[in-house]
Regions:
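Aromatic- and acidic-residue-enriched carbohydrate-binding clefts of CAZyme catalytic domains
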Residues: 26-29, 66-103, 140-193
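Boundary/entry segment of secreted carbohydrate-active catalytic domains
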Residues: 15-39, 186-196
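Short glycine-centered, acidic/aromatic-flanked micro-motifs in structured strand/loop junctions
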Residues: 34-36, 88-90, 222
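N-terminal pro-sequences and low-complexity stem/linker regions of secreted or lumenal proteins
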Residues: 34-39, 52, 63, 108, ...
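Classical eukaryotic N-terminal signal peptides for Sec-dependent ER targeting/secretion
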Residues: 1-4
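Active-site-proximal helices and loops of the catalytic beta/alpha 8
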Residues: 7-11, 16-30, 44-51, 55, ...
Length: 271
């Protein structure tokens, strides 16, 4: 059973209606995932194509600063899912380019949904300056076991779950051990403790920065590896959506979760 948790992307004054109304302009209800596109190209796509064909939103790749490491003389997609900081410096572009994309897409009625990576940071053993290892921005980092130092966001070893589980999730844990699924490392990725108030502050602060820019919603990566109570505490700190982004007349609060449970190949989401 695969469980995926996504921010509800809905605005409504009634919680039981939160799963029916996507924050899009002009009743558009289709989302396109422009995976690994550059911000400048997404902005142009909103203006030249998406607005004319009924698309309501674009889901973009994680915009935060990330690991930079080649594999087979190429840059693999998974480096985007190993954050270094919450600075808006990624292989998709700069902070200014991200802001410009959000503004231009919103202007033509296409909303932006951000893929947020908050379960973890880089893989254990990754350190900037080691052979072939860098970051997409200017932040230093040291993911060595027991060091776990990410000054670009302020995290150190005290902000990770090593004290709960000092190792990886095992395959069998997914059948019978929620504690290990949520507290141990996912394929070696340094697992953040979302129960720590400093971690909650940094994650919610970054999400609020994106809301201020004009983002309309979030996909939360690796949600099943985080405790629901911790996620609720983080998302409970979020601001209202900007009034020019929300289409609600009396409440533009971003609702918490939408849950999908599937037992077959994932083919689509219905919002």
């Amino acid at each position: 059973l695969l469980v995926i948790l996504v921010a509800a992307l809905a605005v409504t004054s009634h919680a039981d209606e939160a799963y029916d109304e996507l924050v899009t302009a002009n009743n558009r209800d289709s989302i396109v995932h422009l995976f690994e596109w550059r911000w400048t190209d997404i902005a142009k796509e909103c203006e030249d194509f998406l607005q004319y064909y009924g698309y309501g939103a674009v889901q973009v790749s994680p915009p935060m600063e990330h690991l930079y490491r080649e594999q087979n003389n190429d840059l693999p997609w998974w480096i985007r899912y190993q954050p270094v900081s919450y600075k808006l410096q990624s292989r998709s572009g700069s902070e200014n380019e991200f802001v410009d994309m959000v503004n231009r897409c919103n202007k033509v009625g296409v909303r932006i949904i951000v893929d947020g990576v908050f379960n973890h940071m880089t893989g254990v053993g990754q350190r900037k300056g080691d052979s072939g290892i860098g970051s997409s921005g200017d932040s230093d980092f040291n993911g060595y076991d027991g060091v776990e130092y990410f000054p670009g966001v302020g995290y150190n070893k005290d902000h990770f779950n090593d004290w709960r589980c000092h190792g990886d999730i095992n395959g069998g844990d997914y059948q019978n051990n929620a504690e290990r699924v949520k507290n141990c490392r996912l394929v070696g990725l340094l697992d953040l403790n979302q129960g720590h108030d400093f971690v909650r502050e940094k994650i919610s602060g970054f999400m609020n920065q994106l809301i201020d820019i004009g983002v309309a919603g979030f996909r939360l990566d690796a949600s099943k590896h985080m405790w629901p109570g911790d996620l609720a505490a983080i998302l409970g700190r979020l601001k209202n959506l900007r009034s020019d982004v929300s289409n609600a007349s009396n409440n533009n609060r971003l609702e918490l979760f939408k849950t999908y449970k599937i037992s077959e190949l994932l083919r689509k989401f219905s919002f």
